[in-house]
Amino acid sequence: MLNAVGIDVAKRKSTITIRRPGDEIVLPPCDVHHNQTEINELISYIKSLKGETKVCMEHTGRYYEPMAYWLSNAGIFVSAVNPILIKDFKDDDSFRAPKTDKADAAKIARYTLDRWSKLKQYGLMDEIRNQLKTMNRQFGFYMDQKTAMKNNLISLLD
């Protein structure tokens, strides 16, 4: 039995739904706030599901990182997907798709079922890559500040 957990991540809360093949709804869309109690309840619920479970979320900004980290450390398969792939995923024939957190979570869950075997697991390398990107950004900022200070000193000495 396959369980696809679709998570639409936001700053302080995430909208979550769980679906199975045949569009069977295990958990209708609901909000989970980013606090330890609710995250632990979610982890317990996901682990209690029968069959194989995969969690999928969009990696928008940095909001997804804590949720991906918590779930991954709990031993749950997590995949963070480029939002463009989710946006371009055509899962129904409707011309006008709703744009709400609940609809997004459901679309992510359907995407998870459709791409089940192709999902890449979130892991340590993703965290290291993010840390390196942050350090590189900080180094660039430092070098810009250093150059500005040198130019300022030169103009003061002239």
How should these model regions be labeled?
Residues I39, Y64, A105-A106:
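A general structural signal for well-ordered alpha-helical segments in protein cores
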Residues F77:
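Residue-level detector of anion-binding/catalytic polar loops
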Residues M1-R20, I108:
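Gly/Thr-rich phosphate-binding beta-strand-loop-beta motif of the actin/hexokinase/Hsp70
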Residues K11, G61, L85:
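Short, glycine/acidic-enriched loop or turn micro-motifs at the edges of active sites
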Residues T53-Y63:
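Short glycine-rich phosphate-binding loop at a beta-alpha junction
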Residues G22-K54:
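Nucleic-acid-processing active sites and adjacent nucleic-acid-binding tracks
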Residues S72:
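Anion (oxyanion) recognition and catalysis
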Residues Y69, A80-D158:
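Long, charge-rich intrinsically disordered scaffolds of nucleic-acid metabolism proteins
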